[in-house]
């Protein structure tokens, strides 16, 4: 499982264009030490299967970002990774969004090109979900109600804004507002400092590069 996750980290580094030694060290460390990843190893008899799902998710992102027609194998990888664990689609989306953010930070980047990349990633994700839903219902038409599995593919558009805001709220609560009891005070302080420092550095970068003036006109 660790070997597969290490390979997944290589896909992430390549997809995001990170070439420094620091990135090569920190990205695998973050992937292996993230809380959900650590909990994965509490079920050692399934760890290798979940690691395959993570590898497929990261490989899908790599195909999508690296090649013009990479969305084709990318869709295949995302469908297969959802077949192992649906939540790994969120991992792929997170890496894709991070890639778009890094693209915007490049001095030679054009907002129109980044926007097209974002649309491409969104469409690929939607197609992957549709293909996975169709295949899963063909193979197992009587889906059970575990965690709302029988409602998969059904989305109330009216509730969508609230669901998106709730997702951000949960992330903020996990790291800052309402951390779990197993998170020590020191870890909580480090989380808060890291979030504030990241926000400050991003704002300072945009101000220094004056993106607020010309990012939409380049």
Where do the PLM segments sit?
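Transmembrane-helix motifs of polytopic, lipid-linked glycan transferases
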Residues: 2-18, 201-205
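Membrane-interface micro-motifs in multi-pass membrane enzymes
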Residues: 4-5, 22-65, 83-88, 92, ...
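Membrane-interfacial loop-to-transmembrane alpha-helix junctions, especially the N-terminal start
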Residues: 18-27, 69-71, 114-121, 210-218
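Juxtamembrane "helix-exit" motif on the non-cytosolic side of transmembrane helices
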Residues: 33-43, 104, 134-142, 204-209
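Membrane-interface transmembrane helices that cradle and orient dolichyl/undecaprenyl
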Residues: 57-71, 105-108
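Perimembrane helix-loop-helix junctions
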Residues: 91-126
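Luminal/periplasmic active-site loops of membrane-embedded glycosylation enzymes
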Residues: 144-179
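Hydrophobic, aromatic-rich transmembrane alpha-helices
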Residues: 173-213
